[in-house]
Design a protein with these regions (language model features):
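Short, basic, alpha-helical segments at the C-terminal edge of helix-turn-helix-like DNA-binding modules
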Residues: 64-71
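Amphipathic alpha-helical segments used for helix-helix packing
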Residues: 92, 107-132
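Hydrophobic alpha-helical bundle segments that form small-molecule/ligand-binding pockets
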Residues: 126-132, 139-167, 204-211
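An amphipathic alpha-helix signature
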Residues: 17, 71, 94, 142-150, ...
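Amphipathic C-terminal alpha-helical segment
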Residues: 103, 107, 121, 171-189, ...
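Helix-turn-helix
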Residues: 11, 15, 19-61
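Hydrophobic alpha-helical connector segments
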Residues: 61, 75-112, 164, 168-171
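N-terminal intrinsically disordered/low-complexity leader segments
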Residues: 1-11, 153, 208-211
Length: 211
């Protein structure tokens, strides 16, 4: 990945990334041609290759950009929500889930699916480098939950009975599946219902583990 520092060059690079992310989400990685990205971003072939070594290099940069923007967006949404009590670590997990639900609601008019999900489907079986990076993306999502799950488990006295890392990954699986169900059913309440079940499952799991 090539490094640029000038404001104009940075703006051009970000425009290419934004259009690539949009097209990857809408059409998929394999069906999106570099020429389409260049046209959508209004850049020449020379300008494109000034910033990226090729489509693969661009794909990794799209993932990095997506994860950074996702994290920033969720943090900003959380700051506008009522905070949980200091002694309620599970409330921090629920706050993140509520922020995810709000972020999805804000983006429901966008065409195309989740770029992470789309690239996972398209590339995990055919490109080991992308498979590893996409796995890191999902694990990065899981790490947002794990510290709060650790605290909740310690609070319940269930430290020897709950694998918080696998529990965090389970949450990510529910989140990603709920996003797909919401889109395919075109039911904006689908995610809310699934998250309600998830929250109740987490409450009961920790309560059961402490007995």
């Amino acid at each position: 990945m090539r490094t640029v520092k000038q404001p104009r060059a940075l703006a051009t690079r970000d425009r290419i990334l934004a259009e690539a992310a949009r097209l990857f989400a809408l059409k998929g990685y394999h069906d999106t041609k570099l020429e389409e990205i260049q046209s959508a971003a209004e850049v020449t072939t020379g300008a494109f290759f000034h910033h990226f070594g090729g489509k693969e290099d661009l794909g990794f940069a799209v993932l990095d950009r997506h994860m950074g923007k996702r994290r920033k967006s969720l943090d900003e949404i959380e700051r506008r929500m009522p905070p949980p009590r200091e002694d309620d670590p599970l409330g921090r997990v629920f706050l993140r889930l509520d922020a995810i639900q709000e972020m999805v609601r804000q983006r429901e008019q966008r065409k195309g699916g989740c770029v992470i999900g789309n690239l996972s489907t398209a590339l995990s079986d055919t490109h080991d480098g992308f498979r590893r990076r996409l796995a890191e993306c999902f694990d990065e999502m899981a790490r947002e939950f794990k510290p709060h799950l650790d605290a909740a488990v310690q609070q319940s006295g269930a430290a020897r009975h709950v694998d918080t890392w696998e529990l965090a990954r389970y949450i990510v699986a529910i989140v990603e599946g709920s996003i797909m169900l919401t889109r395919t059913h075109r039911d904006r309440q689908m995610m809310a219902r699934q998250f309600d079940y998830l929250k109740e499952h987490l409450r009961q799991s920790l309560a059961a583990s402490s007995t």
